[in-house]
Design a protein with these regions (language model features):
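Catalytic-site signature of metal-activated, phosphate-bearing donor transferases
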Residues: 10-201
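Short beta-strand-to-loop acidic/aromatic patch adjacent to the donor-nucleotide binding site
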Residues: 1-9
Length: 201
C-alpha cells in the first residue's frame, strides 16, 4: 500500500489494530487514505535529524489516495494507488468509515479531502540535495527512459510544492548542469509581487 517514503499516520489511535476495530469498517473491503505531502521545510541540504524533528511545516493536502485492501480477495488486480476488481464487489470507505458505494473501486482520488482520523504522509521532497541524489541514482521507465521528461516532471512538482529560493535554484543548476531560467523568473516575479517575500510557487 505504501512506498518507502510514505507512512500511515493515525490521528486518534495508537495502533492499526485499534483503528481497524471501528465498526464502520466491518463491511468495507477497501479503506482509502488521502495523501498529505510534506514540503522540504526549506532544507537545501540533507539533515540527519528524525523526520518528526525535521518537518514541522503543515502538510499539503492531496486528493489522491492509497488503498488498504482486505485479505482473501481473489479477483484483485492492482494498479499504482488503488485496486481494480469485479464491479460486483463495490463497497469501499474513506478513512473515517464513511462508505463510498461505486462500481469503480479503483478510483485514485477522493474529495472532499479528509485527514480527520488517518492519512498517508508522503515525504516526497525531503531536501533539495536529496532530490538531486535521487536524480543521480537513476530513474524508472515511467518516463520512457527520457531524462529530460523525468527532470521536468520532478523539478516542476518540486518547485510547485516548495518555496522557490535562489539557493535552491543555484544548487540544482550547479549539480545537474541544468538551466532553471524559468524558475529564476518565477522567483523574481514573486519577490516583486509580494514585496520582497519569498513565496510558494
Amino acid at each position: 500500500m505504501v512506498d518507502m517514503d510514505e507512512y500511515l499516520y493515525l490521528v486518534e489511535d495508537n495502533s492499526l489494530k485499534d483503528y481497524l476495530s471501528d465498526k464502520n469498517f466491518e463491511k468495507c473491503d477497501f479503506i482509502k487514505f488521502n495523501w498529505a505531502i510534506s514540503t522540504d521545510n526549506n532544507l537545501v541540504h540533507y539533515d540527519n535529524r528524525s523526520l518528526l524533528e525535521r518537518f514541522k511545516y503543515p502538510f499539503l493536502k492531496d486528493k489522491f489516495v492509497k488503498t488498504m485492501i482486505r485479505g482473501n480477495i481473489s479477483d484483485l488486480k492492482y494498479w499504482v494507488h488503488s485496486p481494480n476488481i469485479s464491479p460486483l464487489r463495490n463497497i469501499s470507505c474513506i478513512n473515517t468509515g464513511e462508505k463510498i458505494i461505486t462500481n469503480k473501486v479503483h478510483i485514485e482520488s477522493v474529495k472532499p479531502i479528509n485527514l480527520e482520523k488517518a492519512f498517508i504522509i508522503h515525504f516526497r521532497f525531503k531536501s533539495t540535495e536529496e532530490l538531486i541524489n535521487k536524480f543521480k541514482r537513476g530513474y524508472s521507465n515511467w518516463f520512457g527512459n527520457n531524462i529530460i521528461n523525468f527532470l521536468k516532471a520532478n523539478l516542476g512538482d518540486y518547485f510547485d510544492q516548495n518555496k522557490i529560493t535562489l539557493e535552491k535554484i543555484n544548487y540544482v543548476e550547479k549539480e545537474l548542469k541544468f538551466n532553471l531560467w524559468y524558475y529564476r523568473i518565477r522567483y523574481y516575479f514573486c519577490k516583486i509581487l509580494f514585496f520582497d517575500k519569498v513565496c510558494y510557487a
